[in-house]
């Protein structure tokens, strides 16, 4: 469920969404725009992308707490791309089976 047959990585799309949200964009608007732009994604990929982006956003505080328990660099000091990659990874490990 990472790269589909059109060469689009759903995890990269989720990361892009999370970075836009951090820049102040509304989560539902960014997600809708991405889903419209990549409407050829399979139903399974769209569901995965939605769950990963929404779940990571909803549990951001908890995910940062977990990351901070194991990282020498606190999440607020990390580069946004690194912080959001780690958030996605922890969310997938803790809440998803993929």
Feature-to-residue mapping (PLM):
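Class I Rossmann-like S-adenosyl-L-methionine
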Residues: 1-98
């Amino acid at each position: 469920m990472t790269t589909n047959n059109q060469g689009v990585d759903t995890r990269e799309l989720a990361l892009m969404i999370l970075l836009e949200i951090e820049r102040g964009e509304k989560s539902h608007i960014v997600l809708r725009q991405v889903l419209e732009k990549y409407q050829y994604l399979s139903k399974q990929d769209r569901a995965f992308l939605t769950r990963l982006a929404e779940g990571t956003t909803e549990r951001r505080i908890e995910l940062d707490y977990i990351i901070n328990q194991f990282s020498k660099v606190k999440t607020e000091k990390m580069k946004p791309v690194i912080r959001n990659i780690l958030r996605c990874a922890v969310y997938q490990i803790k809440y998803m089976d993929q």
